[in-house]
From Swiss-Prot:
Membrane topology: Multi-pass membrane protein
Source organism phylogeny: Bacteria, Bacillati, Bacillota, Bacilli, Bacillales
Family: Belongs to the GRP transporter (TC 2.A.7.5) family.
InterPro entries, A to Z: Sugar_transport
Positions of transmembrane segments: 5-24, 34-51, 58-80, 95-114, 121-138, 153-170, 177-199, 212-234, 241-263, 273-292
Compartments where located: Cell membrane
Major localisation: membrane
GO cellular component terms, A-Z: plasma membrane
Protein name: Putative ribose uptake protein RbsU
Oxidoreductase listed as a keyword: no
GO molecular function ontology, one term from the record: carbohydrate transmembrane transporter activity
Function field: Could be involved in the uptake of ribose.
Source organism of the structure: Staphylococcus epidermidis (strain ATCC 12228 / FDA PCI 1200)
Amino acid sequence: MDFIAILIGLGPLLGWGLFPTIASKFGGRPVNQIFGATVGTLIFAIVLALFKGIGLPGGMALVFSLISGAGWAFGQIITFKAFELVGSSRAMPITTAFQLLGASLWGVFALGNWPGITNKIIGFLALLVILIGARMTVWTETKQQEYSKNLRSAVLLLLVGEIGYWIYSAAPQATDIGGFKAFLPQAIGMVIVAVIYALMNMSKGNAFKEKVSWQQIISGFFFAFAALTYLISAQPNMNGLATGFVLSQTSVVLATLTGIFFLNQKKTSKELMITIVGLVLILVAASITVFIK
């Protein structure tokens, strides 16, 4: 593993770490955020496809790639709704924890990961630590009824959103399509869902004509940059899948801290300390789940 590989592996730290903060900073409704983000991702994917000479796949590879992108868009819409309730700095550790749990459980029960009783015990204990870490990131010193209600609603929303993120990661595994080949059709699937969602919400305003929707394209560039650098990082001649995944999960730290300091999603000193400990627990436990043989 060389310096260049590490730099590329940290690309998702910047892309996925800043994506929720930038999307929240531009503001707008979830429909504005998802439309702009998916259009930005599609633009990025088209440029990449033209640069590398990658065409659209055919057959079921195309279908599952479109479904994958649609799943992400569904999950991200739900996540944007959770941002409205508790802010990105609190929602991101929760959704990251749920995604780690979903990916790990899928790997165990569908792909045969963590063979043997000992590995399964270690793995499930690590998942428990991830949940504890996520809970620590939303702890507050003052018990406010409205916050507790919003937090419960956000957690339920993010649980539902995990279905979409699971589809995003699992659907391409139904074929032998590579990450680069799937990138463009995934982006197309994302935009299709975003357009449908925007049409369904026309009674609340025309997202296609609202300036903030087009500003959100910038947030989409950050998401797409993270996705691309993750694909490169996960290659065997770079960091490999396991190390690349762990490096990418550091994005939750940046997403949480930038939400606190740049979006004024304030925490007391004690809350901030407990949040940081919770984030460390999530990262350490996530690393354990990946490196279990």
